[in-house]
Amino acid sequence: MKRSLLGLALVLGLLAAVPLVAHHSFSAEFDNQKPVVLKGWVTKIDWTNPHVWIYFNVKDPKNGQMTKWGFEMGPPHLLQGSGWTNKSLKVGDEIEVGGFLAKNGSNRMSVNNQVGVKFAATGQPVGRGGAALNNATQ
């Protein structure tokens, strides 16, 4: 009887973890064969779990039109380990972001840990960079 209950608990535990794995699937949403570096101005910061999202306007060099973009990063607690806080960036900051484009063609990207997020004026990285920027496998 104990063995059956243990087996059932194990199966239920594994089934419960399936949505978590699906949620953190970088390859389902982003294309690591499509890197991009964009420069723009921060418009909104969502410092929330499970992932921090930062939105920014990118100016088209050809026609001067602004396009809204967003990029996904790791969860707040991992970003804090890389020197980020919820005040590292503020609305209006000009930044340069390296990442991978969304597979669905939307103006979304996932931060590339090697390129990261920099202040455009100085080239200085925001925080210390590294794997905590996005805990997805890239």
Predicted region positions:
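OB-fold/S1-family single-stranded nucleic acid-binding modules
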Residues: 102-132
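Short, structured beta-strand/loop micro-motifs enriched in basic residues and often containing a Trp
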Residues: 73-81
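Short boundary/loop segments of OB/S1/cold-shock single-stranded nucleic-acid-binding domains
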Residues: 21-36
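Bacterial N-terminal signal peptides
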Residues: 7-19
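Short aromatic-glycine-enriched beta-strand elements
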Residues: 48-59
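Positively charged n-region of N-terminal signal peptides that target proteins for export
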Residues: 1-7
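Conserved hydrophobic positions within beta-strands
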Residues: 40-42
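Short nucleic-acid-contacting surface segments enriched for D/E, G, S/T with interspersed K/R
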Residues: 81-97
